[in-house]
């Protein structure tokens, strides 16, 4: 995958939020849709772009599709996660989105248990 494809895939706030969430745990598309407050088809489209760029991977379990960070691009993924953590620390608007996402994700994790 070309670096240009990776940057294009990350050139959207929703996809940045998805990448940040996948850095914490594996999630189903429906769970991502809940956290992001967007429709499942819309989230699936964003996930497809991340997968096409090699930044995320799908895993099927029955009728569920789970997503996780790509393991094939370890150093690239690590650098992207570092960049996202730094952006969250320095960009108040992105930090607010990430904090809201974490609160919603915590509720989803609790429901899983």
Regions found by a protein language model. Give the residues of each.
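Positively charged, low-complexity intrinsically disordered regions
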Residues: 43-46, 59, 110
């Amino acid at each position: 995958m070309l670096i240009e494809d990776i940057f294009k895939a990350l050139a959207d706030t929703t996809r940045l939020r998805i990448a940040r969430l996948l850095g914490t745990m594996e999630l189903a598309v429906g769970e991502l849709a809940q956290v992001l407050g967007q429709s499942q088809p819309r989230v699936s489209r964003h996930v497809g772009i991340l997968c096409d760029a090699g930044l995320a991977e799908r895993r099927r379990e029955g009728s569920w599709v789970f997503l996780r960070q790509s393991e094939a691009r370890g150093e690239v993924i690590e650098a992207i996660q570092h960049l996202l953590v730094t952006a969250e620390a320095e960009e108040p608007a992105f930090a607010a989105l990430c904090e809201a996402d974490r609160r919603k994700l915590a509720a989803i994790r609790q429901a899983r248990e």
